Curated annotation (Swiss-Prot):
GO terms for biological process: DNA-templated transcription termination; transcription antitermination. Transmembrane segments: none annotated. Belongs to the NusB family. This is Transcription antitermination protein NusB. The keyword Transcription applies. Keywords: RNA-binding, Transcription, Transcription antitermination, Transcription regulation. GO terms for cellular component: cytosol. Involved in transcription antitermination. Required for transcription of ribosomal RNA (rRNA) genes. Binds specifically to the boxA antiterminator sequence of the ribosomal RNA (rrn) operons. Pfam families: NusB. One of its GO terms (molecular function) is RNA binding. It comes from the Bacteria. The keyword Metal-binding does not apply. InterPro entries: NusB-like_sf (IPR035926), NusB_fam (IPR011605), NusB_RsmB_TIM44 (IPR006027).
Length: 155
């Protein structure tokens, strides 16, 4: 049960992170300023440590993540809606840096965030891009391959 509670708190943290990363993308405010604003407004029952780690991690690596993601997109990154760009950055960061979070959890959470905050059908785009991104993360290859082979066994 504890893991379930922790998972829900992380899900809520991701929801706040998308909002914070959107603000970062649109305003260019620093991670410190955004963190202060979110803490002052009250974050509710979320994993605050996870929120803090990821707001700084994603913003510190934004240019690198953007470069990696750009190679997988069908259009320039700047043409993506800031919400989708924020979700992609968050998902890419988790896939590459938070290896204890299962691959499928990162993808599923990102898809749900796109359904909640993104444009109609953006969840499909997010799913495809992050799945391709996961293939570029060497340490995710075994986990991703295992999932794909199990899917193939069912067909």
């Amino acid at each position: 049960m504890a893991a379930s509670g922790e998972g829900k708190r992380r899900s809520r943290a991701r929801s706040k992170l998308v909002q914070a990363l959107y603000q970062y993308a649109v305003t260019g405010a620093s991670a410190e300023d955004i963190e202060r604003q979110f803490l002052a407004a009250g974050l509710g029952d979320i994993d605050v440590a996870y929120f803090r780690e990821l707001i700084y991690g994603v913003t510190d690596r934004a240019a690198e993540l953007d470069e990696q993601l750009s190679a997988l997109l069908d259009r320039p990154l700047v043409q993506l809606d800031p919400v989708e760009r924020s979700i992609l950055r968050l998902g890419a960061f988790e896939l590459s840096e938070r290896l204890e979070v299962p691959y499928r959890v990162v993808i599923d959470e990102s898809v749900e965030l796109a359904r909640r905050f993104g444009a109609d059908q953006s969840h499909r785009y997010i799913n495809g891009v992050l799945d391709r991104f996961g293939a570029t993360v060497a340490l995710r290859a075994a986990e991703r391959g295992e999932r794909k082979s199990r899917r193939g066994d069912r067909q």
